[in-house]
């Protein structure tokens, strides 16, 4: 059986390697590792012209919108909190277009951390711009439990209370249209959402690529492998 092609969005940042110092498409290695170990083929999707998103998504079997910078608050009608990071406008525009194309075409979609937040914003939802105590230390992945909502797509993948790797200071506030919560943290923070009106569209607030639990990515790969 042919393995499905899973596109993973990337940073576009200044980077230095060897004798070079220039802008580069950057993707932490755990992302393609997770796709590959879950049975898929991974390809990088650096920011591009938003009007090409639908054509690109049509060539993919599945889409992963990866973690990264805070979503610019203007995207959900808010002023920036002083604790919100600098915007990545080109990436916001590109990834919102990819999400809209995936939802319109029924392409299986997984949003990770920022990717979950963008899914919510794409559907008209809003974000909490800062949560105290959700980052243990700068650059250190923490862990906490998430509880699935019975009957949801996420619960079908991980039906029990699960300890997950996490690194975020923002979260979903008002849910976007057609989205339902599918997991919560112990403090009530929404930790997963899914689109009830899409064949397979899930967002998780944590970082599955930083752990060994393949179930969420395996779910995406299975959905991307299924015949249309």
Segment roles from a protein language model:
Residues 1-112, 121, 128, 132-157, ...:
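N-terminal beta1-alpha1 cap of cysteine-dependent amidohydrolase-like domains
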Residues 116-118:
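Hydrophobic, aromatic-enriched interface-forming segments
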Residues 202-206:
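Active-site-proximal beta-strand elements of phosphoester/diester hydrolases
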């Amino acid at each position: 059986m042919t393995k499905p092609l899973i596109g993973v969005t990337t940073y576009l940042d200044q980077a230095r390697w060897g004798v070079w110092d220039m802008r580069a498409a950057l993707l932490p290695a755990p992302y393609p590792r997770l796709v590959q170990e879950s049975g898929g083929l991974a390809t990088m999707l650096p920011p591009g012209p938003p009007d090409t998103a639908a054509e690109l998504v049509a060539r993919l079997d599945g889409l992963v919108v990866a973690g990264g910078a805070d979503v610019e608050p203007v995207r959900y009608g808010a002023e920036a909190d002083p604790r919100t990071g600098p915007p990545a406008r080109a990436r916001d525009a590109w990834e919102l277009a990819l999400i809209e194309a995936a939802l319109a075409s029924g392409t299986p979609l997984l949003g990770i951390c920022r990717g979950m937040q963008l899914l919510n914003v794409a559907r008209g939802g809003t974000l909490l711009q800062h949560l105290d105590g959700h980052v243990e230390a700068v650059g250190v992945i923490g862990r906490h439990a998430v509880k699935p909502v019975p009957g949801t797509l996420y619960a079908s993948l991980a039906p029990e209370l699960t300890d997950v790797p996490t690194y975020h200071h923002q979260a979903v506030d008002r849910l976007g249209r057609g989205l339902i919560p599918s997991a919560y943290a112990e403090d009530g923070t929404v930790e997963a959402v899914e689109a009830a009106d899409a064949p397979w569209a899930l967002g998780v607030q944590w970082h599955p690529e930083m752990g060994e639990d393949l179930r969420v990515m395996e779910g995406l790969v299975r959905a991307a492998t299924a015949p249309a």
